[in-house]
Amino acid sequence: MLDIRLIRKEPKECESRLQKKDPAISLERLLDLDKTVRQLKADSEALLAKRKVLSGQIHKAKVANENADALIQEVNTIADQLVAFETTLQEQEALLEDLMARLPNYPDEDVPVSPDKTGNQMIKSHGEVPTFPFPPKHHMQLNEALQILDFKLPAKTTGSGWPAYCNEGVLLEWALLTYLLNKQQAHGFQLWLPPLLVKRDILFGSGQIPKFDGQYYRVEDGDRSLFLIPTAEVVLNGFHSQEILNEQDLPLCYAAFTPCFRREAGAGGAHERGLVRVHQFHKVEMFAFTTPEQEEVVYQKMLHVVEEILSELQLPYQLSLLSTGDMSFTAKKTIDAEVWLPGQKAFYEVSSISKCGDFQARRSETRYRDAQGKLHFVNTLNGSGLATPRLLVAILENYQQADGSVVIPSVLRPYMNNQEILLPKTVR
């Protein structure tokens, strides 16, 4: 949520900044509604003041045994006006709040302006894209022999886009997750296994709704609805909603492992088959609450963790600064870490590290008290640390051998009983 006071003070500047993300954004209707709401409040306060004066006059008239019928009639008329004003005010405030809730975060000044991902800037490249002395296989082709993933059986029970891990695929997935969690803990992140279902207001606080309403799996629980989380960012942000934190306790750096649920799987087309885009996947998510002064330090820390993981896995990767048209609704700056997938012949995002400023904190009402006792909104940051499906794809495709086997990265072997290689089922 943005600060309405700044929009009132600098409407043109705010509109210009927002149009970097979406050129169609106009603040004209919002400002008109804001004026209407403020005028209604002023008129209501004037009527309340007038009623108070009249009530005093009625009291004096009664004490003096004077006729107060006209005064009483005027007070009754004011009461009816106040009821009408309150109804109109509630309607106009709801419209204003909805417009405010649909405005994205302002992008930082150093973010490239572009309508889409073509404006993203590659800021770092690490490792060499592998060349194979044989035709490299897509991970789905490798899986035919390895048999570590199953897409047919879960398609019967649930539908397409819901893969199941099996055999050594289960062990490799858990090895990867254990390694990721250990890495987060080593860097001082507090580990969490949070709930997978959240209330609607928690989705609102993280910025998922109302803009993306209807894109989340919903569970009916009696007279209320709960939603399956698309990322642990949602629940971690909600942990301190409507709270006042102490400045000396900041930054709070959390890392959570959760399954994530997204309805848009398959949106990338048939070429993104397999694990590249699915409805349910595992992810370790980093999330932090900071002061504005701590924000950049924690941001660099998150970037460092992601780079360390990809370097230790010995996967070729690049970092891209996202343009305004490719950033999320809540972010003011995002750097994507992308790994090379030979099967796609392209780099694919495995982590997004974002600064959100006080955007989510305003929606969630998360503040901190400084040493002087003043209240401020916290800043929030988030970053995938990391999502495993594409990471697993990257391992399978980059570590594949001519015979269809896959070498297990050395950093994962301690979590797989020191197993060094995945062999095709036919040679096991």
Curated annotation (Swiss-Prot):
| Main location per the UniProt record | cytoplasm
Q: What's an example GO cellular component term for this entry?
A: cytoplasm
Compartment(s) where it occurs, according to its Swiss-Prot or TrEMBL record: Cytoplasm
Its Enzyme Commission number(s) read 6.1.1.11
Annotated coiled-coil positions are none
- Reactions accelerated catalytically: tRNA(Ser) + L-serine + ATP = L-seryl-tRNA(Ser) + AMP + diphosphate + H(+); tRNA(Sec) + L-serine + ATP = L-seryl-tRNA(Sec) + AMP + diphosphate + H(+)
User: Membrane-spanning regions, if any?
Assistant: none
CDD domains membership: SerRS_core
Role description: Catalyzes the attachment of serine to tRNA(Ser). Is also able to aminoacylate tRNA(Sec) with serine, to form the misacylated tRNA L-seryl-tRNA(Sec), which will be further converted into selenocysteinyl-tRNA(Sec).
What name appears for this protein in its UniProt entry?
Serine--tRNA ligase
In which organism is this protein found?
A: Chlamydia trachomatis serovar L2 (strain ATCC VR-902B / DSM 19102 / 434/Bu)
Q: Which gene encodes it?
A: serS
